[in-house]
């Protein structure tokens, strides 16, 4: 299907899932600032490299999953499904972007490049190809892709992998299951039609709600532990936001419906984003 360059760029922008990429970039930026070393060129390298690699990984994912996306209402209008971008083209372009992002990270240092590549490989090979179609724990292991973004950011200014970086990565790792299981509970029928064994698809709603609450509860210690590096204001806000997150988790356990799951899902992104922004701001003040 012949399309203009501008239209094709728009299609690829949609395939790259910009709402996820900005959160991954925010994770990388908070990791860079968490180190306490402001190195503009290094931060620029990890943001550019990470953006390319993340976009490439998302595009590969949607190239691979075109058949599943066709039967899910939530994904049925994606450019790959509509035929604007072919499966082969999406995969090739995605690989090129992932490779480019890894090379840009290498301009900073090898560890940054390694974590950028690690995030992409975990998302594409471990999550998309291996676990997502086979295991209800797919998103648990897939959460390492988000952790890798934070680790890449920290490595960009330190060339190291130490306790602050590990804590930030574990925060994102533990945040991921509760966030995406809530989404899967809301769109349970969609995932079921596509044959994707998300936890809420194969387990009862009340059990899924308890697992979402457990994931969120296990996330909170890592959020609070970052107070040691981000300061008192961060600690206070993290405590308040964590209490609100658990409020939504309790509501979901009491009433495990798609509507309550959606409320939990909608709060969890701002929860993480605010914490990441606070880490950045506390290092600037």
From Swiss-Prot:
It comes from the Archaea. GO terms for molecular function: protoheme IX farnesyltransferase activity. HAMAP family: CyoE_CtaB. It is a multi-pass membrane protein. Pfam families: UbiA. It is an enzyme of class 2 (transferase). Belongs to the UbiA prenyltransferase family. Protoheme IX farnesyltransferase subfamily. The chain crosses the membrane at residues 19-39, 40-60, 90-110, 111-131, 135-155, 165-185, 220-240, 265-285. Its EC number is 2.5.1.141. It comes from Metallosphaera sedula (strain ATCC 51363 / DSM 5348 / JCM 9185 / NBRC 15509 / TH2). Gene3D superfamilies: UbiA prenyltransferase. It is found in: Cell membrane. This is Protoheme IX farnesyltransferase. Carbon 2 of the heme B porphyrin ring is defined according to the Fischer nomenclature. Converts heme B (protoheme IX) to heme O by substitution of the vinyl group on carbon 2 of heme B porphyrin ring with a hydroxyethyl farnesyl side group. GO terms for cellular component: plasma membrane. GO terms for biological process: heme O biosynthetic process. Its main location: membrane. Pathway: Porphyrin-containing compound metabolism; heme O biosynthesis; heme O from protoheme: step 1/1. It catalyses: heme b + (2E,6E)-farnesyl diphosphate + H2O = Fe(II)-heme o + diphosphate.
């Amino acid at each position: 299907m012949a399309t203009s360059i501008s239209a094709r760029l728009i299609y690829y922008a949609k395939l790259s899932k910009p709402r996820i990429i900005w959160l991954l970039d925010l994770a990388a930026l908070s990791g860079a600032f968490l180190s306490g070393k402001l190195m503009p060129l290094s931060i620029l390298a990890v943001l550019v490299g990470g953006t390319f690699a993340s976009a490439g990984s998302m595009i590969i994912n949607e190239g691979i999953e075109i058949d599943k996306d066709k039967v899910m209402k939530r994904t049925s209008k994606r450019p790959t499904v509509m035929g604007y971008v072919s499966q082969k083209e999406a995969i090739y372009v995605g690989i090129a972007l992932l490779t480019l992002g890894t090379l840009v990270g290498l301009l900073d240092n090898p560890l940054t490049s390694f974590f950028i590549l690690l995030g992409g490989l975990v998302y594409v090979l471990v999550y998309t190809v291996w676990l997502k179609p086979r295991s209800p724990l797919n998103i648990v292991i897939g959460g390492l892709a988000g952790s890798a973004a934070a680790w890449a950011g920290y490595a960009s200014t330190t060339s190291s992998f130490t306790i602050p970086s590990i804590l930030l990565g574990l925060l994102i790792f533990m945040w991921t299951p509760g966030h995406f299981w809530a989404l899967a509970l809301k769109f349970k029928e969609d995932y079921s039609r596509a044959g994707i064994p998300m936890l809420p698809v194969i387990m009862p709603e009340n059990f899924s709600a308890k697992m979402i609450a457990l994931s969120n509860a296990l996330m909170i210690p890592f959020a609070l532990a970052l107070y040691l590096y981000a300061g008192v204001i961060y600690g206070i806000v993290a405590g308040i936001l964590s209490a609100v997150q658990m409020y939504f988790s309790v509501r979901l356990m009491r009433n495990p419906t798609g509507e309550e799951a959606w409320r939990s899902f909608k709060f969890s992104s701002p929860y993480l984003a605010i914490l990441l922004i606070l880490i950045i701001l506390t290092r600037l003040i």
